[in-house]
Amino acid sequence: MLRRLLLALASACVLLVNGAHAVESLDADLVLLTENFPPYNMAKNGKNFAQDENIEGIAVDIVREMFKRAGITYSLTLRFPWERIYKIALEKPGYGVFVMARLPDREKLFKWVGPIGPDDWIMLARADSKISLEKLNDARKYKIGAYKGDAIAETLAKQGLKPVVVLRDQDNARKLVNGQIDLWATGDPAGRYLARQDGVTGLKTVLRFNSAELYLALNRNVPDDAVAKLQAALDQMRKDGVVDEIMARYL
């Protein structure tokens, strides 16, 4: 009995030491998570699960080059839904998630690398819609579709607009066309791209109500040195024109 107890304690100590080393080592593997959010990140086969070379997009290409320059190894997985991968990156050391809008409420929850790209917040309506908006408050009387767990949906909810949320933002394109919602609160260019992928075109922008910057968000336990190396790599990529070159390939 005593021998078993000593062996168990020894094994626990080894795990603790190895775990601490994995968090503190500058060159430790980082586990990166992302979602289908075209044209920034997307599975090549259009599915809601993909890994490594089967993922593409503006942010994916930028992140790959950034990690290569920083000399930090990583694995990349695209999963669904957003709320799940957000929670994993928030709670698990050595994890990160992209792309995420950097908002005041999130500032102290993660360590940030970016910006990777812009994400304007817009209200889309059907081509034949008579809706006219001058400010966000004007949308209160309409049924607004949004993406569950997204910064846009969170912001609308905080302002009392009560968005109708879905697990896949592209579903809002079809709901808008079918008259199930009056407006679609989404990002630009992501929303239009998603709509085209679902065969929906001709939507019109009736309000542009915010402009956010998208980042790589890393768990708070990721070493500061690693964050600094990644940020320096991204800054140099921007100076070299690499970020603009990547953007031009998709837009």
Annotate the PLM regions:
Residues 24-101, 108, 146:
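Extracytoplasmic small-molecule ligand-binding "clamshell" domains
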Residues 73-81, 146, 162-169, 175, ...:
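Short beta-strand-to-loop elements that line the ligand-binding cleft
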Residues 90, 100-109, 182-210:
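A ligand-binding cleft/hinge motif common to bilobed small-molecule-binding domains
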Residues 73, 151-164, 235-251:
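Ligand-binding clefts/hinges and TM-proximal coupling segments of bilobed small-molecule sensing domains
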